[in-house]
C-alpha cells in the first residue's frame, strides 16, 4: 500500500476517530509528517494494522506516552531563547504591574511539556514580586509530561540558561549535583492542567501567554483558529509570545499588534 493511500484509507480514518475519542487528540489538525511518525512507531513495535496499534497505545501507558512524545519534537529547557525571558523580566512584567495597578497578573504556559517553561515563568513571577496567590497556569495534552513536570526534577543540562543566583535560590541539588529540583515556593506558583488546545475552551483575561514551538506542528487552518483563540484569551494590553522560528503572518487580521520579535500584543 502506498504511503498517501495509507493516510487517506478508511482504516487510518478510523484510527484517528478512535484516538480522538479516548485522548481528545485530532490528528487531522496536524501536518502530514505526523502520519510518518505514526508509521515509524508502528514499525518499531512490530504492529501491522491501525486497529492493533490503537489497542496497543490504549492499553499501555508507556507506548501512549511514546506516541505523544513523537507527535512533536520535545526540546525543552529553562529560559529557552533567554532574551525573551529577560525582556519579560525587565520590561513586560514591570509595565503590566504599572498598568494593572497591582501584582496579580495572570500568566499561562500553553503546551507546557515537562515543565521547564512554566517554572521559568514562575521564577520570574517571584523575582518581579508578583502575588503568589495567582499561580502560573501550565497546560498540556500529555498527562505523562504533566506528571514529570509536577515532580520538578531536571538534569543539569536543562538548566544551562538559569542564572547562578536563581539556581542557588530556587533549586535544590540532588544526586551529587547531577540533577536539580525546583523548590517548593516555585512549585506552589504553578498549577498544572491537562488541556487540549484545539477542542477545549480557553480562559480569558491573561496578561502574558506563552505558546512556543507547539503551533508549528499544526496545519495552517488550525494555526489560524488557535491564534484567534489566544488573542481572545488575552486581556487588553496583554502579551502573546511565540517561538523563535514562528511568525503570525496575518496578525493584524486577528487583532494583534506586533510588539517585538516573536512578541504580539492585544491593544
Where are these regions (language model features)?
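Extended basic-aromatic, gly/pro-enriched interface segments that bind polyanionic ligands
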Residues: 134-210, 214-222, 247-249, 267
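Conserved beta-strand signature within the Rossmann-like core of class I S-adenosyl-L-methionine
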Residues: 237-244
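Short hydrophobic/aromatic beta-strand or adjacent loop that forms the aromatic wall/cage
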Residues: 259-263
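A short glycine-rich, Lys/Arg-flanked "PGG" loop and its adjoining helix->strand segment in the class I
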Residues: 224-236
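Conserved SAM/SAH cofactor-binding pocket of Class I
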Residues: 96-166
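Residue-level signal for inorganic ion chemistry
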Residues: 88, 209, 234
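Conserved AdoMet
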Residues: 1-105, 227, 243
